[in-house]
Amino acid sequence: MGRSRGFIEAIYPTVQQFFPEQLGGVSAEQFYRAVNKAQPSLVRTESDELTYCLHVMVRYEIEKQLIGGTLEAKDVPAEWAKLYKEYLGIDVPNDRDGCLQDSHWSSGAFGYFPSYALGNAYGAQMLHNMEQDVDVEDSIAKGELAPITAWLHEKVHQYGGLYVPADVVRNACGTFDPHYYTDYLTRKFSELYGL
């Protein structure tokens, strides 16, 4: 929702007030397009909505190989560079901006990255289901977020500590289906880029 056209249009006048020099000649449409620009990047946390999961996939592939014993730690930088080129078309200039950019592995947090991709897919399915009960675009345009937060509280937040994520999603919006996420990305970026 935070990168949606409706949300950008609703908050943009306030954003312009805080940054009058930088955004004085920039329309809400231009700002929306800039916020949603799809372009491969070197750093996961600076990536766009469309390519983010490719960053996650690189990490997942490397974790699988490490845990499966088919990749040694000393070979991670080369594998990272290979996968970044293959998945994102990017050359990795150094290990700091490559395989050392995240703190997860150095703290022993393996298997964590896929949860980011799942969160995006869960979010798309929840948004789809929320739109059946709440006029999301209208609520955002009017700055009335109470119907959205009420839906989230009723269907998701109050159960977050009681059930595992898959059960929270199933209870809120049925069996998990990643097509909601791929459909969301296809619709959004087809419209943005006239595809």
Residue ranges of model-derived segments:
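A conserved active-site cap/scaffold subdomain adjacent to cofactor or substrate pockets
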Residues: M1-L71
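C-terminal, non-catalytic "cap/extension" segments appended to globular domains
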Residues: V56, Y60-L195
